[in-house]
From Swiss-Prot:
Homodimer. Keywords: Cytokinin biosynthesis, Hydrolase, Isopeptide bond, Ubl conjugation. GO terms for cellular component: cytosol. Pupylated at Lys-74 by the prokaryotic ubiquitin-like protein Pup, which leads to its degradation by the proteasome. The proteasomal control of cytokinin synthesis is essential to protect M.tuberculosis against host-produced NO. Disruption phenotype: Disruption of this gene suppresses the NO-sensitive phenotype of an mpa mutant, and therefore restores NO resistance to a proteasomal-degradation-deficient M.tuberculosis strain. In addition, the disruption mutation in Rv1205 partially rescues the defective growth of the mpa mutant in the lungs and spleens of mice. Catalyzes the hydrolytic removal of ribose 5'-monophosphate from nitrogen N6-modified adenosines, the final step of bioactive cytokinin synthesis. Is involved in the synthesis of isopentenyladenine (iP) and 2-methylthio-iP (2MeS-iP), the most abundant cytokinins detected in M.tuberculosis lysates and supernatants. Is also able to convert trans-zeatin-riboside monophosphate (tZRMP) to trans-zeatin (tZ) in vitro; however, it may not be involved in the biosynthesis of this minor cytokinin in vivo. The gene is log. This is Cytokinin riboside 5'-monophosphate phosphoribohydrolase. It comes from Mycobacterium tuberculosis (strain ATCC 25618 / H37Rv).
Amino acid sequence: MSAKIDITGDWTVAVYCAASPTHAELLELAAEVGAAIAGRGWTLVWGGGHVSAMGAVASAARACGGWTVGVIPKMLVYRELADHDADELIVTDTMWERKQIMEDRSDAFIVLPGGVGTLDELFDAWTDGYLGTHDKPIVMVDPWGHFDGLRAWLNGLLDTGYVSPTAMERLVVVDNVKDALRACAPS
């Protein structure tokens, strides 16, 4: 295990990811992201669970000496197995509070393959950025085409005027961790 990185790291990245599937490639991707965030001396903020991709991203960050901040609503403490190894574990009353704290504590967002909860977090952060609440990078890592259907639908909304080009430009889509971290890095 590496020495702990100073908790006052210059940069904090929220990772939105799955809490259910255990596909090897998903867990490997999440672990790669967690290790890469820690390797840069950045802080990881994530959903606070110790299952699926959430557990993999946080465990890998800590294994590489990174500082981890988990944010979990009390209704999910047992369902998502709250990660009591987190350097800081924040238990909220609601999902909304979880998302707000994660957004407030982060300088950038990485979205990994996930389901409805991941999409909820993505759309919240993306909408807030589009509306000018923040100017933080929002980066979707999609190495296997998990989000192809979503992206096709969004492009259809763009083509018909329901989504603006400016909004689409706020969402960066990459297929590897190196490019994701580059897109998240401070300018």
